[in-house]
């Protein structure tokens, strides 16, 4: 996509309003949550904030010094946002105390906590969530995935029984009858480079929950491979097949099957030939890739070649919703991820 110039240069030139994200906006507006944006050093934050506040998608906290806010918010109306200066916040000591409490076994002192919070605003954002002053956080427009996730793992932790965080994209493919009328969850596309059978099974369960939460339909999870039902022999195939067994044992209420090639997972005619007795093949709507490489490449292929909407990466498995952005994101991508984070916060509060 080519950016248009001037004030709207952080939005896509041709923005197709898709039904999925409209439903997410509506859900977010119905029960507004407070989301922290720690990247006041990026103008896209303020372009997104203007739209979020104008449309009532979420309450916003923006972390930044007066200089950062003044420089990067020029031309944007962020009336209604709460601005928190990390160097002069009356609640700062509360967050320092919480940081030390959570990381005392790692030797974190109050001085170390203060320095880290002032140097990396994502730590500040996570502490605001931990202390109940915010419901979620979104970062990553100008920080790496690692820099976004690390504070969340250290301070917020994973949900009980969850061993690791994974990331999914909600894909909306135009003019497509596959999946749930063109809606899919793709995972893991963003986080975990060291997947094994146990972790893949966990990704399958988390992704099924995410699909049901965001799409409102029953998930059908395909564990993808270059083999269908043993058509090829390789340790990578065995890893996926073992993940299917683990998932079916641990999560019997979820429809999970594999290993399946992509065409067998999606196309009924191919499924009839390659996996005729499968409960998922030919109708999968949740795709679990066998590696981070495959997932990351796969979502980008569909996004670029099929002109699909790619909403995410949305993190799953954390105790509170914290989400990452692509450093190449547009402001409207930030708006979408904030809305999805708000919906996750609604679910977490139930």
Describe the residue ranges of each PLM region.
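Short, Lys/Arg-enriched N-terminal segments with co-localized hydrophobic residues
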Residues: 1-17
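Anion-binding alpha/beta catalytic cores of soluble intermediary-metabolism enzymes, centered on
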Residues: 17-281, 286-350
